[in-house]
Amino acid sequence: MWPDGICRVTDTRYTKTIQYQDINYQLSQNEDKTAIFEAWCDFLNYFDSSVQFQLSFVNLSASQETFARSISIPPCGDEFDGIRAEYAGMLQNQLARGNNGLIKTKYLTFGVEADNLRAAKPRLERIETDLLNNFKRLGVVAAPLNGFERLHVMHDILRMDEQEPFRFSWDWLAPSGLSTKDFIAPSSFEFKTGRQFRMGKKLGAVSFVQILAPELNDRMLADFLDMESSVLVNLHVQSVDQVNAIKTVKRKITDLDKSKIEEQKKAVRAGYDMDIIPSDLATYGAEAKKLLQDLQSRNERMFLLTFLVVNMAPTRRELDNDLFTVSGIVQKYNCTLKRLDFQQEDGFLSSLPLGHNGIEIKRGMTTSSTAVSYTHLDVYKRQL
């Protein structure tokens, strides 16, 4: 991690992170929803196949002291101090009642492949500028995170059971011989069993969402973030080169047509109507042709999506209850929740806002099927 916010994840992969706020998508009128949706589709189409990005939605509990500091209004020694105190008290009461002590943040992490930092830095800065301009056109408040802020985010996730303030300075590294990892690492990790893990005093479980529906429902993400518990929701998205995507779909259509011809030959030999073919072939053929039309004429791109959910809880019972809740949410939208058996460590690492995806479970989706990343604007937000 460097002070400017660039992080070297592997020997050749460098990433940066942008924190962004939400917009009132769920509360908007249908016309406004359509405009927001189309603008977000254009936002996603900006990414080419060389840029993999990660959308992170983090719900973490915070101490009352943290909330109190964030909304405190210091007195100024004038006749309005009474109003300031009353207003701060009202904010604290509303905050404690409104979100059950949860801080909800959203991040976009993007990365490029490069031989060294010198080659990666100008590309990352150009992409960052373009993304900030795209956010601005969407009417979304966004800001890039520097190295200290990215470490702070990681500290809050990895040490969520301690709720201690993040203490770090770049000047401390050389004299102490420590690295940035020493300031954010939890007290312990334990990946003994294949279906859950322990981080500090908390138990966790990493699952992936198996997307069976043709597209993601715009309410599913909102339901995840409305849970009153610590949860990390991550979408790893990799754009597929448009030419390769069209070639792949055409090959699939050719394979389906070949299978259809074979079935028709069987029908003729068996003496029944050759138009009677398996329903799956007819369905898949029509869907493949529709997908090809979307890619060629509707400004759609193909994306490979990995959908990960991390639940954290202090006890096994609470963790099981949270997993049951998440499973109910995904089933409501024609998806299934699958535990990452013996991949908990890789799954948790892929759920940190680092832009690294170590889970090779991907689902092909089009632009419009992927664009579900807005819910509603919270009244309270941490300052960007």
How should each PLM-predicted stretch be described?
Residues 375-383:
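Conserved small/polar residues in nucleotide/adenosyl-binding loops
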Residues 1-374:
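Extended, folded cores of ATP/NTP-driven motor/assembly subunits in large transport
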